[in-house]
């Protein structure tokens, strides 16, 4: 900007303010008391604007920000962890906040803005405010320890399951409700001898032969391959389900979240 243009802009500002901001003499120009006061505040304002622009640039280019996720222990450990590792390597300056809660608690955090996205066990009740995207198909299978090896070879009918000691997740779990619903639809009521809040504990208890339990097959491959657990075929089997990503509709997606979602390998849509 040329000097005449600067001088004209200052005079226009003085006219608008109704007071001279500069004292002009043959030896130079210096600010009036009003000019000094205005400059002090404008300097702060311009500094804040510049800082805001820099922070915005950093967020857009993934140089700062926060990724806030809600999910259960099982989903975090068996599905999200590899993506979180890759994300952190790509964007080390993004703060990652993962809150481990049940499906319903995660949805509550999503609705109150505490997290930007949930990765939860499906299905959930339809809600027009939620955008649900399946991520991976999973299969619930019945397993037992060495004591039940013969049962694994023979298989069983669901109606006979109440004859055996059963270990299940607590009834607040969406996975537990899914198993209960499956059993009830087939005329069977499940009465576990023990209810636990952790899938890992169910696996550990089943390994020491405390009872049978339902696990997610895809997340229990190591125990099955090492023969610490044995899959018991049940007729009818539990219908397959999915782990899904849930976001609030009509809510802008933070750049930090978009960068994470771009890493996830979603199932291809079938024609």
Pin down the residues of each PLM region.
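Secondary-structure junction motif
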Residues: 151, 165-186, 253-262, 270-271
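Short beta-strand->loop
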Residues: 131-141, 226-240
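Central regulatory/effector-binding core of bacterial HTH transcription factors
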Residues: 64-126, 196
């Amino acid at each position: 900007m040329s000097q005449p243009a600067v001088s004209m802009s200052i005079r226009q500002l003085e006219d608008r303010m109704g007071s001279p901001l500069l004292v002009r003499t043959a030896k130079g120009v210096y600010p009036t008391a009003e000019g000094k006061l205005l400059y002090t505040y404008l300097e702060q304002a311009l500094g804040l604007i510049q800082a805001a622009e820099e922070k915005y640039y950093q967020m857009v280019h993934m140089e700062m920000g926060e990724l806030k996720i809600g999910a259960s222990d099982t989903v975090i450990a068996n599905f999200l962890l590899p993506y979180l590792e890759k994300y952190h390597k790509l964007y080390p300056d993004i703060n990652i906040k993962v809150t481990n809660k049940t499906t319903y608690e995660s949805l509550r955090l999503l609705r109150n803005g505490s997290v930007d996205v949930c990765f939860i066990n499906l299905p959930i009740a339809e809600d027009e405010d939620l955008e649900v995207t399946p991520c991976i198909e999973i299969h619930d299978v019945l397993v037992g320890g060495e004591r039940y090896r013969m049962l694994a070879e023979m298989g069983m009918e669901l109606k006979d399951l109440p004859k055996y000691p059963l270990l299940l997740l607590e009834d607040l779990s969406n996975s537990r409700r899914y198993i209960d619903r499956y059993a009830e639809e087939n005329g069977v009521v499940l009465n576990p001898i023990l209810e636990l809040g952790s899938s890992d504990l169910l696996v550990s208890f089943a390994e020491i032969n405390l009872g049978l339990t339902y696990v997610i097959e895809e997340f229990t491959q190591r125990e099955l391959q090492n023969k610490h657990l044995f899959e018991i075929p049940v007729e009818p089997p539990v219908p397959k389900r999915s782990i899904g990503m849930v976001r609030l509709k009509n809510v802008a997606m933070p750049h930090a979240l978009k960068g994470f979602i771009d890493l996830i390998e979603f199932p291809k849509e079938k024609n």
